Amino acid sequence: MGVVVVASNAYTRNGLRGYCTIMNKTRYVVINQKQPEEEQRVVAGHEAGHLILHKTQLKGGAAMQDFDVYNVSSRLERQANFFAADFLIDDGDVLDLMHSRDADFFNVAKELCIPSPFFAFKLYSMVNRGHSMRVPVDLNSTFLK
């Protein structure tokens, strides 16, 4: 994919988690390294989702800045989260853990070393692709739509 990834401490005050942009045909992802490592992985995957899915919005050097990567009010942010969840988390790992005897939402997220809000995107994606499992939200709600 050819992406320059930069870990930065420059955005600690304003809460910026990460951003991506395309300048002179070079793709950039900047991640706030003051976040826990598991959050940095999520932000990296989320920004990769923007670079792949939202090229049009990034034309002309525009940046997609993320202060809340779990934002569900924006279609573009949801798409980037679903991309990241499917890219970073293997379906088989989720299925194996969900079928263990002491599986619950939070334990599985912890075992996968991912934040629980991010795990909700993975479960929702898997249910939409036909997997049957318990999910933490009512799928008839507007939470991820």
List the predicted regions and their residue ranges.
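Active-site hotspot residues in diverse enzymes, especially metal/ion-binding acidic/histidine motifs
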Residues: 1-145
